[in-house]
Amino acid sequence: RVATIDTLAPDDCYDLVFVTLQAGQLPDVLPILKQNRSEYFVFVGNDPHAVEVMQAMQRPADKIAFGFQSSGGHRDVDKVVSAHVGVGMTIGGATAPLSGVFRYRVKTAFEGAKYKLTFVSDMDGWLKCHLALILPACYLCYACSGDLSKATKEQRDMVLDAAWEACEMLKAAHIPVDDKENTDCYRAGTPGRRKMDAMVLTLCKTPLGRLCVSDHAMHAVAEMQYLDEAFEGLRARTSVRMTAWDALRSQMPSWDIMRKKTAKARR
């Protein structure tokens, strides 16, 4: 079991500080993190504002990293159910590769663990591209009241069509997009798209969809709304038409209704 802390005094010092919060919670703790004397920080999770976070920390760019762990699951009363295929993390600087010293510290932290580290040079772009798929999947979850088995073929297709549109929008907004890992996987008629079609079908027709997608979407409505609003802010900088995106998004209840449903379920 990994030891964690829920307080961080200015004089506390760690070799590495991993910050794991839902998107939207970070602004409240950034002042505390900024005052701490530790040198190296890794912000883990969905973050549409990596560059802004890096700047707010007021440290050299090579002292701040962003990471994303590909896993899913849910918490029961007495246990945590986890879903993952080869646990690991994609990690890197917001807009530049990590320094050799930083990479060494991260590798040392996971030494001896069966944990794959994938280093990239532009995590701000990577995270935004990640949202290009995550948000349409989220809209589908809400449209189906969390039961992905109810999704129609048309809706499944719209998820990937919307992801392709989102990648095109990001490029128009001058966000770096790795076409091989993103756009080419969502473009209709390509081998990559056929693989993604199979993946989406599997998620919708097996328990993997609940573990990997809908559990998180249904229990993190505030986070998903925060990510949605951030993505809409990016979109406002472009004139790219996103018909599949808009059609799928229009099928979900309003964010206000989703928040009320979440609050009612917690009572």
Where would I find each of the regions flagged by the language model?
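Rossmann-like NAD(P)(H) cofactor-binding subdomain of soluble oxidoreductases
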Residues: 1-80
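Rossmann-fold dinucleotide-binding core
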Residues: 49-130
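Helix-loop-beta segment of a Rossmann-like dinucleotide-binding subdomain
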Residues: 80-94, 142-151, 208-218
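Generic structural signal for well-ordered, non-membrane alpha-helical segments
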Residues: 99, 103, 155-163, 220-228, ...
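Flavin-binding catalytic cores
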Residues: 110, 155-180
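Inter-helical turn/loop segments and adjacent helix faces that build the functional surface
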Residues: 114, 118, 146-153, 234-242
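Active-site-proximal catalytic alpha-helix in oxidoreductases
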Residues: 124-167
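NAD(P)-dependent Rossmann-like dehydrogenase/reductase catalytic/cofactor-binding core
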Residues: 171-267
